Amino acid sequence: MVKINASAITYTKGGEISKILSGTGFSIDTETLGPKQVVIQALATPINPSDLNQLAGTYASKPNFTSELDTPVPVAIGGNEGLYKVIEVGSDVTSYKNGDWVIPKMPSFGTWRTHALVTLDKPENPDPFIKVSSEDDKSIDLTQAATVSINPSTAYQLIDQFIKDWDPKGNDWIIQNGGNSQVGKFVVQIAKIRNIKTISVIRDGKPDQDQIVKELLDLGATKVITDKEAESEEYINKIVPGWVNEGKVILALNCVCGKSGSALVSHLTGNHLADYRSPHLVTYGGMSGQPLMYSSSESLFKNVTSKAYWLTANTKRNPQSKVDTVKKVLALYKSGDIKPVPFNGKEFNIKSTSDDYIKLFLKGIAESKTGKQVIVYN
């Protein structure tokens, strides 16, 4: 192997996605590979909502710009999540070998590219990858490895980070909106393993509502209700308390805000006078675009602790936490305790042109509202 013709999805500034993205061709000369360099080839690159926010210029984590693609001006490469195979290693590289499957450890790697030339042992990021498998290891498949970095890792940390004293007898509950999201589907699976009961809130009026409810129950949700039900006095004062009984709704996971987020607080169980355990409201998204408001009496008398969660911030603050979380999620896959959430795969021939590449990505972005899109390379 001497020269690799590669493609990347690039942009020079944030804005309207269909107008700012380009398909950029570039090449990698493996004959000049440095002793501490590796070449990786894409196996799968997801399209996530955070990627689109970053492209639009509305995301707090900014992209990295590079001149390594020989473009007239520095460009950013889209994407924060991706699975790659190591195909070339430098003479001094001992931590990776050809055939290893790796994912970027840090955000803003720029995953939407067919290949990358990466230098190891940089002071700012000495080991940029997490090894998740290899082509001769059949215990983890591509479907599991391709999306392990964000959604299941977020779900794992949401359950693990805020409540440290889960009731071992199974009397604790989680209530979450966005129940049909990728994160929501992993939350119910991981919670079930830990003997934590869950109430998943989904949007009312979806045509496939019965199918969604069945899927969530099959994954391990204890109860599934609609947002209208969650906001109703009957569910707040009678139905949900009847389910919970002597237990406690100790954690509310909010990715919607607005009325949906406010309703979660109403379902939290807390007594500031008698209970040392503070129920937690954790916000990790705001899909409604509306503010999160709830009454001062609920905050005071229930002793509600409100926290924000962001996987990107956790990873930047403590990169090892990302490594540890990914390894724990992979262990759950290997044991069969959790299963991957299906995504919509779009196949791309890695030898195709950069024009074909950008067309496929724009199609995937346009269809991302119908479910998670992942570019799968062959």
Curated annotation (Swiss-Prot):
Entry annotation: catalytic residues: Y59
GO molecular function, one term: enoyl-[acyl-carrier-protein] reductase (NADPH) activity
Enzyme Commission number, as recorded: 1.3.1.104
Alphabetically ordered keywords of this record: Fatty acid biosynthesis, Fatty acid metabolism, Lipid biosynthesis, Lipid metabolism, Mitochondrion, NADP, Oxidoreductase, Transit peptide
Gene Ontology cellular-component terms listed: mitochondrial matrix
A Pfam family reported for this protein in Swiss-Prot or TrEMBL: ADH_N
Swiss-Prot/TrEMBL GO biological process terms: fatty acid biosynthetic process
Enzyme class: oxidoreductase
Entries under PANTHER family matching the protein: ENOYL-[ACYL-CARRIER-PROTEIN] REDUCTASE, MITOCHONDRIAL (PTHR43981:SF2)
Protein name, per record: Enoyl-[acyl-carrier-protein] reductase 1, mitochondrial
Organism from which the protein derives: Debaryomyces hansenii (strain ATCC 36239 / CBS 767 / BCRC 21394 / JCM 1990 / NBRC 0083 / IGC 2968) (Yeast)
